[in-house]
Amino acid sequence: MAEKKQWHETLHDQFGQYFAVDNVLYHEKTDHQDLIIFENAAFGRVMALDGVVQTTERDEFIYHEMMTHVPLLAHGHAKHVLIIGGGDGAMLREVTRHKNVESITMVEIDAGVVSFCRQYLPNHNAGSYDDPRFQLVIDDGVNFVNQTSQTFDVIISDCTDPIGPGESLFTSAFYEGCKRCLNPGGIFVAQNGVCFLQQEEAIDSHRKLSHYFSDVGFYQAAIPTYYGGIMTFAWATDNDALRHLSTEIIQARFLASGLKCRYYNPAIHTAAFALPQYLQDALASQPS
């Protein structure tokens, strides 16, 4: 029997992970990035950009539930949601489950990502692209948040790592633009890497976001696809109370929402804001 091909992630030079490739479904270099989708017996369909795993069918629900339900339920009455990135449609899928949300705008820099994900990752979007509340904008995220006349209650930055096209979504210009189009009391969240291996990313984001928001922090989730431990999500708002809501308040909102989740629950919500001491120490040691 012929040995299966292997796909090796190239995010780190000295260590990493690989996937056995059962079948390559799509591989093309677009105007912005090198994109591949392949099948793996353990993780289902896997999508990678520029040599870095972005999502798998096996565990994507953890990432997307935590990126959406934490800010939306903490906010409590979000009507207008902005997603930066998220071309695979899974973030959109989770936001559409909130029936009180009136409009969902998604800004994706690469139209090719949206088109092939509709074809090759149908379980991710699960028909959410057809939701009447949804509007797709093909634009650079930094440009959009600094130019739009729209305002939002929750902004979700479903960004790649801060290399290549995703680098601009970790800049002060982007964070300032998000503050500009965020309604009073609104919440900004963003993917911020695996803090044990990418601690400098969290420190840099915390420093930059603190220039624009009065309450900046992080919450976490364990997502097997992202090599190295716990995935960290940046959190920023001017409503200092939202990060510290009791489990009882979140529980009441969760029950009222009718959500049925596979990872997220109210206890996970409040526990996710507890950070390991090494990260707390690193953040505390930074100059104000």
UniProtKB/Swiss-Prot annotation:
Keyword terms: Cytoplasm, Polyamine biosynthesis, Spermidine biosynthesis, Transferase
One GO cellular component term noted in the UniProt record for this chain: cytosol
Family assignment from sequence similarity: Belongs to the spermidine/spermine synthase family.
HAMAP family noted in UniProt: Spermidine_synth (MF_00198)
Function statement: Catalyzes the irreversible transfer of a propylamine group from the amino donor S-adenosylmethioninamine (decarboxy-AdoMet) to putrescine (1,4-diaminobutane) to yield spermidine.
Superkingdom to which the source organism belongs: Bacteria
Protein known as: Polyamine aminopropyltransferase
One example of a Gene Ontology biological process annotation: spermidine biosynthetic process
Binding site for spermidine: H64, D88, D158, C159, T160, D161
Gene: speE
